[in-house]
Amino acid sequence: MKTAVFSSHQFEINSITKANNNKHELVFIEQSLSAQTIDLAKNCKAICIFVNDTVDATILKKLLVHNIKCIALRSAGFNHVDIINAKKLGFKVARVPEYSPYSVAEHAVMLMLALNRKIVHAHNRINELNFSLNGLGGFDMHGKTVGIIGTGKIGQQIAKILYGFGCKIIAFDQIENETLKKQCNVSYVDLKSIFAQADILTLHMPLSQETKHIINKKNIHLMKTGVMLINTSRGGLIDTKAVIDGIKSEKIGYFGMDVYEDEGGLFFEDHSQTVLQDDVFARLMSFQNVLITSHQAFLTETALQNIATTTIHNLNCFEQNIQSGNEIENLKN
């Protein structure tokens, strides 16, 4: 089946090509999917999209013009797709529900440790032959209270890792995980309590109308002074301007993020020769206690292999008109 693979990146093409094994005719397109690039999918039977490719009502109509009714997502999240209209119009949409919870969990813990022990600053000093330790002090993770908001597959791995550090773990989720309670001594609390008690807060939940900007001015006010905030989940969970105000007031002592609400057109691209136009992001970059990575928490060989394998499986099922088990129905993101 001829498939247009939008937002294709060098780091993933080999994995996808290997998993495909010449089964489908894949057209790798570097550009992201948009009203201006959709015609590049002409004569294709399916499109394959990445996390920042938006499929809204306009794109759906244009896909119908090209007789394309199959959409394969190279991601677990699907808030960038108008699922309700897609289903009404008869589109088949499938995602990669799980690729490697370990990769994202490990990255989140890496952000915690790097912020705490000021690893980036220490490295930069060494490069300048400055071996002073002044200002590089951190704290013991052991004994700290970590609040995990969302205990799905990634949140569970976070709990297991940090339990090994000797952290006290509290969590918030609509569904309490009984195994985590027993294995990691996790205590489930309400949102107000997790904000008030946590020394470190880490987000691991989907983006929906209910969770959008769950980190906002009101909830930041409830947090401990000097709290560490980590987001490797969805950029839209955070009101970035409120976080900036929280950092300026020193309510937020550390901020680590791998996702950004307005990352489309910014992340996954080389802008080193251009002027940054996003003033909010530029302000974040100016803080010494902020550590940013560009949506790379998933980026391990294992995850890339799993994403590629599942994506090709979904395309196979589209072509054979059978269920893959990864279809997206009219669900909340």
Task: Describe the function of each predicted region.
Residues G226, G235-N333:
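Rossmann-like dinucleotide-binding domain for NAD(H)/NADP(H)
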Residues D39-L40, S193-I194, N219, R283-L284:
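Structural alpha-helical scaffold elements that stabilize or flank donor/cofactor-binding regions
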Residues N134-T225:
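Rossmann-like dinucleotide/phosphate-binding beta-alpha-beta segment
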Residues V51-N52, D199, M205-L207, S233-R234, ...:
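Short glycine-/small-residue-rich Rossmann-like dinucleotide-binding loops
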Residues M1-A94, N216:
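An N-terminal-biased, well-structured beta-alpha scaffold segment characteristic
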Residues L89-F91, P97-T145, Q157-K160, G164:
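Phosphate-binding beta-alpha-beta segment of Rossmann-like dinucleotide-binding domains, i.e.
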Residues I230:
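Glycine-rich nucleotide-phosphate-binding loops and adjacent flexible coil segments
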